[in-house]
Regions:
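Secretory targeting and sorting signals
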Residues: 2-27
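C-terminal PAP-associated
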Residues: 28-588
Length: 588
């Protein structure tokens, strides 16, 4: 591969180094770095603000399946276990759900991990974010929740669990999109399991399901109509039944996962208002990637979902997943696909591009983007890696095409996870040489990148960053950080605790400044971390991704912190912090 774009950032697009689609990863050239001290103060220098969005209200719901085994403060879980609700303040329904076949008491929502955030294109002060909404971190027991702002992220007065699918053990993978009329579509994955005596998850079928009255797994929709002001204002049925795009007949084969959504809001598109729902179906070890679509209506309803159809994949390699659709202003739908074979332990990733120019009826591709991306194993802590890549699309032409961007995390030969970005300015035919995004000078990790393109064309890549050490004993942030509860004793340790960071680029991927810190406080990822597979297992969870979007001259992220900002999070649960930063001009 040729040189990093950072070395030619000041040149025009014609001079940008390009490689044919399908190049493999080579060692990236050295990049400009900044000191840890400079990164630490960049939060204040850039005028970033933080709001602890999910601690302002008390949310509760009755789970379909309860799990009362708890860890303790000595395990790093202060306030652990499932706790009965005493007083919800959200206005949400907490019991008596139509899809449930049991009558359990309402439980307190504690952790909120993995997230998505969308700015309303009709009103940039209106933002809806969604997140996993845990009643038991130890049991990995959660629905999805939402939190909504009408003042550009300063306050989040409406929040609660997303209703309609309480009859499943878990609802997962938060993602949403606004339609042209301001209705918000949440695409949801409800699924069932019961607990083994060890705390592991058991996926039964038929009468042994957690709730035999419902399909064991589904891809489903909840719509929040424009102008809604209460936590319960969601449309969750279509033609008198739950609004399922797809259902599975069994809970351990032919199972759907990794769903994503995009809506055509381009007035000159022939398919204005079309909603695209994409997901992976795992058929034992191989997988299939599918798309279904419907047309949104102004009142928050929609037409029937089309029969899910297969998307193109690499011949002979049925291991595609991670669909991330976007719609260009001309109505073309693009998505990346990520091929990571189970035979290689899901450690080798080839990223490709597929697209449709006729409203999702027919599809072209795949075109290879980058190959042999190495799935990282993060050092020092127990949380697992997420989706390795993210995909973005610009709404302003570059070189006569709408620009495409892919960012990904890669485990480099050093054993550390780093973040890279590549772009295409010819509809995916060629891609720029991958450029490292994180600018830390020391041997620390960056992970879970998420790319977004602002309305002015500026490219934003947000990611988790581990360069700053954990708060040290006796330091200003030590008590509020909760690191004293961490049995791994990370006081003052580097490449352990986490901040959220962001890097801006011009439309041609010229860097606009250096990495900016988006977290006011460094936080410990081990505290109250959900146990992904079993309470007895080592693997914990932050999420596979987190939310970033732009509008009204600002860029927003919603990401985790366990820090107790102002006494609102004394048990150090995973909470969602919304950061706001001014979006720079798109040209350097």
């Amino acid at each position: 591969m040729n040189k990093s774009l950072r070395a030619i950032a000041a040149l025009c697009l014609a001079a940008v180094a390009l490689i044919p689609a399908g190049g493999t990863i080579a060692a990236a050239p050295a990049v400009s770095t900044q000191s840890d001290a400079s990164f630490a103060v960049s939060y204040a220098a850039a005028g970033v603000t933080n709001v602890s969005a999910t601690t302002s209200h008390v949310s509760c719901y009755a789970p379909e399946v309860t799990y009362f085994t708890a860890l303790t403060s000595a395990d790093g879980y202060p306030g652990g276990g499932m706790t009965p609700c005493t007083a919800a303040t959200t206005g949400e329904q907490t019991t008596g759900f139509e899809t449930q076949d049991v009558s359990n008491p309402a439980m307190l929502v504690k952790d909120k991990s993995e997230s998505d955030l969308r700015v309303d294109p009709k009103n940039p002060n209106h933002i809806i974010a969604t997140s996993k909404w845990f009643v038991s971190a130890e049991g990995y027991n959660h629905l999805l929740g939402f939190y909504e702002s009408w003042d550009g992220g300063r306050t989040w007065p409406v929040q609660g669990h997303i209703p309609g699918y309480e009859g499943w053990t878990d609802n997962t993978d938060p993602v949403g999109a606004f339609d042209p009329w301001g209705n918000f579509y949440a695409l949801i994955l409800p699924y069932e399991f019961v607990y083994a005596s060890s705390g592991g998850h058991v996926f039964n079928n038929g009468s042994k399901q957690a709730n035999p009255s419902q399909p064991p797994e589904a891809i489903s929709v909840a719509v929040r109509p424009a102008g809604s002001t209460t936590a319960t204002a969601w449309i969750t049925t279509h033609d008198g039944h739950p609004d399922h795009v797809f259902t599975s007949k069994t809970d351990n084969a032919n199972t759907p996962d990794k769903q994503w959504i995009a809506i055509d809001t381009n007035a000159r598109s022939a398919h204005y208002g079309r909603v695209y729902a994409m997901f992976t179906q795992f058929v034992l070890n191989p997988s299939r990637i599918l798309v279904s679509y419907a047309d949104a209506r102004p009142d928050g309803t929609h037409t029937d979902w089309s029969v899910p159809q297969l998307l193109p994949s690499v011949p002979g390699k049925p291991f595609d997943t991670y669909l991330l659709p976007h719609v260009a202003p001309d109505g073309t739908v693009y998505t990346t696909t990520t091929n990571n074979p189970v035979a290689k332990g899901f450690l080798n990733n080839d990223i490709s591009l597929v697209w449709s120019s006729d409203g999702g009826v027919t599809w072209q591709g795949p075109l290879p983007i980058v190959q042999n991306v190495q799935t990282p194993t993060y050092q020092n802590t127990t949380f697992s890696e997420g989706i390795v890549n993210s995909f973005g699309l610009g709404s302003q032409l570059v070189n006569g095409h709408y620009p495409l961007y892919v960012t990904y995390e890669n485990e480099d030969p050093s054993g550390l996870s780093n973040v890279y970005v590549t772009g295409s300015f010819d509809a995916g035919a060629t891609w720029t040489v991958p450029m490292r995004v994180n600018d830390n000078a020391g041997p620390t990790e960056a992970l879970q990148p998420n790319v977004n393109v602002a309305p002015n064309g500026a490219v934003t890549i947000a990611f988790y960053d581990r360069r700053l050490p954990c708060p040290a004993r006796g330091g200003r942030d030590y008590v509020a950080s909760g690191v004293a509860f961490d049995p791994l004793v990370p006081d003052g340790r580097a490449n352990y605790c986490v901040n959220t960071a962001i890097q801006f680029y011009s439309p041609t991927l010229a860097p606009l400044g250096m990495n900016v810190r988006l977290s006011l406080h460094t936080w410990d990822p081990q505290l109250n971390a959900p146990k992904r597979f079993s309470i007895a297992g080592a693997t914990t969870f932050l999420g596979d991704y987190f939310g970033v979007d732009s509008g009204g001259g600002f860029t927003y992220t919603t990401s985790i912190s366990t820090f107790d900002y102002a006494g609102e999070n004394p048990n150090h649960y995973q909470q969602q912090i919304v950061a706001r930063i001014a979006t720079p001009a798109a040209r350097p």
